[in-house]
């Protein structure tokens, strides 16, 4: 009887011990479960970081080159061809930008940029001291060079500015008066309204004062007429000349792009896009315009319209 009681008590004790072990095991398991939830394994963390990195790499970078808004230019009629060509190319690259231009003369352009009614003032001359004193900055974007040509058989190789002016105003009418053969001078020029004619007449101080034997409507026509006419003299954009005519030196300086860039050839003028203050002080859109105009693409446009580049 006593032995039975002892076995019962021993069984109860084992049951209690088993229950206690089970409880402790459960608590530990719960504790481990919480820890696992709070801190993922190193493998899981690495995989997550890799996924984030891949997502970041796959996402496209935000562009910073998008431009929008408008640029206004006012000024030189002689710069119309250049301004329009540059505007077209710039707006093609930046479709959300509008470039407007009014061609009302250099003086009006400088006035507009001075009083703030235009972003850019186009001028086909250098700025005057008083204009610079008002804070206007001269930004030369191209150079207009004009060559004087004669037929290849002409003995004359050089003219002074005075001689050239006197030939075109009708004072000098024979080549022997300027060191050539005894041959009448046939004065060839462009039609009224031509930008080349306007530039030439302005540079020799003969606006509307030239006495032409022939007025032709294209550069090619002028060159062809001079080449085929003994005693003829004409003018054309430097880049348009070919071997069918002979270019004259002026004041002892040959008509070359290098001499024009150096300012040694007088029959040339700057094409200026003036700003009120330095380019770096303008808004982002205007700064982008000058980056384009003075960059490779803009200078290529200038060359294509017959101008001397500045870069």
Where are the language model's segments positioned?
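Exported/periplasmic ABC-transporter solute-binding proteins
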Residues: 8, 31-39, 44, 49-311
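C-terminal motif of bacterial Sec signal peptides marking the signal peptidase cleavage site
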Residues: 25-29
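Bacterial Sec-dependent N-terminal signal peptides
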Residues: 1-17
């Amino acid at each position: 009887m006593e032995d039975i009681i002892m076995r019962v008590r021993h069984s109860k004790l084992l049951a209690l011990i088993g229950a206690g072990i089970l409880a402790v095991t459960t608590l530990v398991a719960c504790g481990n479960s919480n820890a696992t939830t709070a801190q993922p394994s190193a493998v899981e963390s690495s995989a997550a970081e890799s996924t984030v990195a891949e997502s970041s790499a796959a996402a496209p970078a935000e562009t910073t080159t998008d431009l929008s808004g408008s640029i206004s230019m006012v000024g030189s009629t002689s710069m119309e061809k250049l301004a329009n060509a540059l505007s077209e190319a710039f707006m093609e690259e930046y479709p959300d930008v509008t470039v407007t231009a009014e061609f009302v003369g250099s003086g009006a352009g400088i006035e507009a940029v001075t009083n703030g009614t235009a972003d850019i003032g186009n001028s086909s001359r250098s700025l005057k001291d008083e204009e610079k004193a008002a804070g206007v900055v001269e930004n030369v974007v191209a150079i207009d060079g004009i060559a004087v040509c004669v037929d290849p058989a002409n003995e004359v190789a050089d003219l002074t500015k005075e001689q050239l002016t006197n030939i075109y105003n009708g004072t000098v009418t024979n080549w022997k008066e300027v060191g050539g053969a005894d041959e009448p001078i046939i004065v060839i020029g462009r039609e009224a309204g031509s930008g080349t004619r306007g530039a030439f007449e302005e540079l020799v101080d003969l606006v509307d004062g030239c006495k032409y034997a022939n007025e032709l409507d294209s550069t090619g026509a002028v060159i062809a007429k001079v080449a085929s006419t003994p005693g003829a003299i004409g003018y054309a954009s430097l880049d348009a000349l070919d071997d069918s005519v002979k270019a004259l030196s002026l004041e002892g300086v040959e008509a070359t792009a290098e001499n024009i860039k150096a300012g040694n050839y007088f029959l040339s003028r700057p094409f200026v896009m003036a700003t009120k203050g330095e380019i770096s002080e303008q808004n982002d859109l205007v700064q982008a315009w000058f980056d384009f105009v003075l960059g490779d693409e803009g200078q290529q446009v200038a060359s294509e319209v017959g101008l001397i580049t500045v870069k």
